[in-house]
Amino acid sequence: MAGGELWAEESRRVEVHDVEHDSGSWALTWTSAVTNRRAEPLRFGSPTTAGREMAGYTGLFWRGPRAFRDGRIIGPDGEGPGLMASQSPWLALSGEHDGADGHATVVFEHAPANDHTGAGGSHPAHWFVRNEPFAGIAPSWAFFDELELAPGDTLTRGYRVVVADGAWEREEIAKYLRTHPW
């Protein structure tokens, strides 16, 4: 509420599933539905839409531990920090643990209903991802352009986050996502 006026209502659902002790992986799905309750449009932006170059984070954001600095950024068709602002169904970051001989991989995947490319008429999403000066991933729906939500409209977005022991390769990630459908 702003000045006593209700601007928006959100319904959020978080579920943990696909816990696999053998592979050391588990998944979390996160779904949010925000409804504009104002009589005028709501505008969602990012630091990039406000003029700060390549800082287009919005929505769900994961900031990794210090150990993931300089971690490996992996996408379906590429690798590295150059995937910042790219579009793809999923993106992963793999890093080495501090003080232990081990790695972990975190995979973010758009829900099929997200229309993340905008091909179906939705506002397109781009990945905010970095491994320096900190590790972070956000499937940003207002990276380059503000998203306008009309009065009474609802913005629904869903994501799956997979957390896995080990430094997974692109093929392992793709296989996991194929064999664990939404």
PLM segments and residue spans:
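A general secondary-structure signal for short beta-strands and their flanking turns/coil
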Residues: 7, 25-27, 55-57, 154-156
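Active-site loop segments of alpha/beta catalytic cores
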Residues: 18-29, 61-63
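Short solvent-exposed strand-capping/beta-turn motif centered on an Asx-Ser/Thr pair
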Residues: 35-39, 166
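Active-site/ligand-binding surface loops and adjacent short beta/alpha elements
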Residues: 41, 45-116
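Beta-strand-rich recognition/accessory modules
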Residues: 107-182
